[in-house]
Design a protein with these regions (language model features):
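Terminal peptide-recognition signature
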Residues: 4, 51, 105, 135, ...
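Extended, small/polar residue-biased N-terminal targeting/export presequences
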Residues: 15-100, 286-297
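Solvent-exposed loop/turn segments at secondary-structure junctions
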Residues: 66-70, 109-113, 139-145, 161, ...
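STAS-typified acidic loop motif
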Residues: 85, 89-117, 253-254
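Short acidic catalytic loops
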Residues: 105-109, 129-142, 195
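A short, well-ordered alpha-helical element
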Residues: 113-131
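Gly/Ser/Thr-rich loop/hinge elements
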Residues: 142-191, 229-235, 246-250
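Low-complexity, Gly/Ser/Thr/Pro-rich intrinsically disordered linker/tail segments
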Residues: 259-297
């Protein structure tokens, strides 16, 4: 646990929070709270609960692996996760046309970009002729940020600077940009609505936040939880890994982030009503487009 405390101090995106977490962890360790926990998975669950109780961040997690963790096993695990994603059609749960000609895309996980670029292209191409697009992230709990970049690339005509991620440990800022050339057709010059809720988390928040800041989408629903930005998996030993927030994501459009405050929707309604409200807005925008108006990327 001392190693975990050191990692939190060194790598947590917020210096004060990292020190607070490390101090509390050491205090509980010295007090013997973890001494009599017999199993690794029990210890991982206890420490995770303690960390989240201190700062209320669902990203924080101590993970336990029964099998020895090696670079080779980690690579095999990533390959297996990618295989499972492809088998599940990359978690694109619904790709539909709703009346009157409104595209509807629902997915609860941002899958691996390399493994799922083809599926993403097929989904976006299938919806390209819609008059408006609704992206449903009300139950999205995050995943791989690269998929968010890819999907956003379908909504902008040119190369667009989406976000900046600052990593405190080495004082490095990484830029995130759209990809000009993507498989399938883009969705340009037409309105986009993103549905969010209290359950929307992590990469789901980042994707919504970026599109809102770029004025490319109207957000409908509830304010999100406000999870931290980017995370890293820090090995403690052969069995334990600490998941720690190491980066803060900001928009180049307004230099803001959503940590702690959450992503605030443009149209605040209960999550259960968000789809119906977005459909009404989309129908209205459809009428406006035929009159010569409409959202532009």
């Amino acid at each position: 646990m001392e190693s975990a405390a050191g990692i939190l101090e060194q790598f947590h995106i917020d210096v004060k929070t990292g020190k607070q977490l490390a101090s509390e962890l050491r205090k509980r360790l010295a007090g013997g709270e973890y001494r009599d926990i017999p199993y690794g998975d029990w210890l991982a669950k206890k420490v995770t609960a303690d960390l989240r109780d201190i700062v209320h961040d669902d990203h924080l997690q101590l993970r336990f692996n029964y099998w020895l963790s090696t670079t080779e096993s980690a690579a095999k695990q990533s390959e297996e996760e990618a295989r499972q994603a492809v088998a599940a059609h990359c978690f694109f749960d619904k790709v539909e046309h709703l009346p009157p000609n409104i595209g509807y895309l629902k997915f609860n996980v941002f899958a691996d970009r390399d493994a799922c670029a083809k599926a993403a292209g097929e989904a976006m191409d299938a919806l390209a002729d819609s008059d408006a697009l609704i992206i449903d992230l009300r139950d999205n709990r995050g995943g791989r940020g690269g998929m968010g970049e890819l999907l956003a690339s379908y909504l902008f005509a040119g190369r667009t600077h989406l976000a900046d991620s600052f990593r405190r440990a080495d004082n490095v800022t990484t830029e995130s940009w759209t990809t000009p050339d993507v498989p399938g057709r883009k969705f340009l010059g037409k309105p986009v609505y993103v549905l969010i809720s209290r359950n929307t988390f992590s990469a789901g928040e980042g994707f919504s936040f970026v599109l809102q800041a770029q004025k490319r989408a109207t957000l409908v629903g509830e304010t999100t939880v406000g999870g931290s930005g980017t995370i890293e998996f820090k090995p403690i030993d052969a069995h334990f890994t600490l998941v720690v927030p190491t980066g803060r994501v900001t928009s180049p459009a307004n230099r803001k982030d959503f940590v702690g405050t959450g992503v605030v929707p443009d149209v605040k309604v209960p999550a259960a009503e968000a789809l119906d409200v977005a459909l009404r807005l989309a129908a209205q925008s459809r009428h406006g487009n035929r009159s010569g108006a409409g959202a532009k990327p």
